[in-house]
UniProtKB/Swiss-Prot annotation:
It is found in: Plastid, Etioplast membrane; Plastid, Chloroplast outer membrane. It comes from the Eukaryota. It is a multi-pass membrane protein. It comes from Oryza sativa subsp. indica. Residues 40-63, 99-105, 139-145, 171-176 are chloroplast intermembrane. One of its GO terms (cellular component) is etioplast membrane. One of its GO terms (molecular function) is voltage-gated monoatomic anion channel activity. Residues 1-22 are annotated as: Disordered. This is Outer envelope pore protein 21, chloroplastic.
Length: 185
């Protein structure tokens, strides 16, 4: 099981305010075929102990295409809602990504294309995201220290973002003032 501590801040919308603070996130990947897995993950708010998110996602990988596709469902808990009300925030998830290696001589520099669609329990689309990222991985920057830099642009929101990952630490920053830090345990 993969476990991480996640801290988010900087949001100005009420929805993002409910997601701020320290959360404990757990993820388990269960292989079901050579190129497919079932991914279950959830998180709890560290201060209240209340669940904030639960999800189950079927993911299929296409190695020859450097692509993957995911389909699943999720529940977002908002402001310590009791369990029956939390089911009102049930959603379906469809996500896809494709990696492009523009320089075959340097496989550590690449372009990622990502898309995600969330739909409510009646299959009405609620959230769409699409992004393009330039990703650069630097192995052994210092002994035992791998670094990954990502510069991305959210196409639908017209907003750039940045990610810096160093071994177990990840820092994300967005131009609208949001940010998050993750530490993989």
């Amino acid at each position: 099981m993969e476990t991480s501590l996640r801290l988010r801040g900087g949001g100005s919308r009420p929805q993002s305010k409910s997601q701020e603070g320290l959360r404990i996130h757990a993820k388990e990947k269960l292989p079901i075929a050579s190129n497919a897995l079932l991914q279950a993950h959830g998180e709890i708010h560290a201060a209240t102990g209340a669940p904030t998110y639960l999800a189950l996602l079927f993911r299929n990988f296409y190695p020859r295409l450097s692509a993957n596709l995911g389909l699943g469902l999720a529940i977002h808990f908002r402001n310590n809602q009791p369990l029956p009300l939390a089911w009102d925030n049930f959603s379906y998830t469809l996500r896809a990504s494709k990696a492009i290696i523009p320089f075959p001589s340097n496989a550590l520099l690449g372009i990622n294309l990502k898309g995600r669609l969330l739909a409510d329990k009646y299959f009405n689309p609620t959230t769409r995201t699409a992004a393009v990222e330039l990703a650069w991985t630097i192995l052994d920057l210092k002994r035992g220290q791998d670094v990954r830099l990502k510069l991305g642009y959210q196409l639908l929101h017209k907003m750039p973002y940045f990610q810096l990952r160093e071994n177990n630490w990840t820092f994300n920053a967005y131009m609208d003032g949001k940010w998050d830090v993750r530490f993989d345990l």
